[in-house]
């Protein structure tokens, strides 16, 4: 596949998450996708990824991710994204705070046969927890 076709797959991935239409993932994510940044306690593969999304949706029901950059080379696509949402449900064991968060992250996707088969992801988890008031900002004790 061309790099433009691979980028289109990642755009559909983001669309599936932003529109909460996770059925779209069945067409573009391999059932046995390897996630190098999975969250402990969730099963591996595509179904585990859907469960992680549902956890975020229940914590940030108005959450929206936007793609800021897409860079592709060979069978890999790098996405820089921004997530915005209001914490109106429990998140990682903490009760809802009602606070709005804006956080950024980077994902790397490897694509084979028209499907995402591997994923690496990093996001500003510390900044998110600070915005939620769950971890103090430096100098605030």
Which residues make up each language-model segment?
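C-terminal and inter-domain tail/linker signature
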Residues: 1-141
């Amino acid at each position: 596949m061309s790099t433009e076709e691979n980028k289109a797959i990642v755009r559909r991935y983001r669309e599936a998450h932003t529109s909460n239409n996770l059925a779209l993932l069945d067409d573009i994510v391999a059932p046995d996708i390897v996630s190098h940044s999975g969250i402990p306690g969730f099963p591996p593969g595509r179904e585990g990824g859907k469960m992680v999304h549902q956890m975020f949706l229940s914590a940030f029901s108005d959450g929206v991710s936007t793609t800021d950059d897409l860079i592709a080379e060979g069978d890999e696509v790098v996405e820089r994204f921004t997530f915005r949402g209001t914490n109106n449900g429990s998140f990682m064991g903490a009760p809802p705070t009602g606070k709005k968060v804006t956080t950024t992250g980077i994902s790397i996707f490897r694509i084979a046969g028209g499907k995402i088969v591997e994923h690496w992801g990093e996001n500003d988890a510390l900044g998110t927890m600070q915005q939620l008031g769950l971890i103090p900002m430096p100098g605030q004790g």
